[in-house]
Amino acid sequence: MRLMEVTQQRIDTINESGSMSGVGAIHISEIEPTLDYLEKSLGMDLKNNVLGSVGKKEFSGDIDVAIDVEPEAMPELLDKLKINPDIIDIAKSSVIMTKVKIAKFDANKTCDRARTGYVQLDFMPGNPGWMKTYYHSPADGESQYKGVFRNILLAVICALYDRKDSAEQTEDGRSLQSEQYLFSPTKGLVRVRRNPVPKKNGQGYTKQNNNVIIDGPWLTPDEIVNVLGLDKKEDLNSYESLKSAIEQNYPAELTAKILDSFANNKQIQDIGVPSDLQIQEDVLMYMRKLL
């Protein structure tokens, strides 16, 4: 398998930039009253379906809520939100973005982001149980790094752990058939058979791959750690806990390959390689100079 297959992989993340006009951060003490009010107004369970770092950090850039709704029911949900007076603004992309008023807003609580009295609340369609696992974010003090670091490391582990590649390869170095795990934002952890897609003219292969699910899905943290050969569900909490778990459970060669692929991932390169991996790379470079 080419390293580029893993290092160029992008992972879905929760966006905290606030795409709606006039929204700002929300303090942890304001989240529950805001959701309590909206639950009564909308007749929906919101508090049990929040995702990411909401309620784990002092301030959140927005509120993300999983909604178990079928695609054909989305127009009805949109209409319901549009006519509700507590939904001040609404827009749809891959999620439903809304602007809502913060209940019991305390202007004295400030942070390095704007505090406007309004917050963006995103409704994200999907299986709430799985989305809580996929979009898990560590609490304050639990990790130096955001949940995206954990998710990318977990995706790399899935791509390399118990991977089976055929000896035959394409001209650009891909195996003609691979079996691997895939950490999917919509399907859960699944086992797939991957084949490069042939060109229509029959001359070689395109850059695309075709994945066929052959086992799974595994949706709960307990199931995932069992399938991936780890110890306990807490291993999935953060980048640090996941890195420690593979160092304790995987052969040194596989661990090194996973961490090298993670450090070379394009997203990780863009947001910054964790300092512990930078130190390891500096030591390796020094040792190479001595040889």
Region annotations inferred by a language model:
Residues 35-75:
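Active-site nucleotide-donor binding segment shared across nucleotidyl transfer reactions
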Residues 46-47, 85, 166-169:
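Short, surface-exposed acidic
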Residues 82-131:
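Conserved catalytic core of two-metal-ion nucleotidyltransferases
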Residues 111-290:
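Catalytic cores of NTP-dependent nucleotidyl/adenyl transfer enzymes across multiple folds
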Residues 2-51:
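Helical scaffold of the NTase/Pol beta-like nucleotidyltransferase catalytic core
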Residues 37-41, 69, 81, 90-95, ...:
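Intrinsically disordered, low-complexity eukaryotic regions enriched in glycine, serine
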Residues 73-84:
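Short amphipathic alpha-helices in soluble, non-transmembrane regions
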Residues 1-2, 81:
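Short acidic, low-complexity intrinsically disordered linear motifs used
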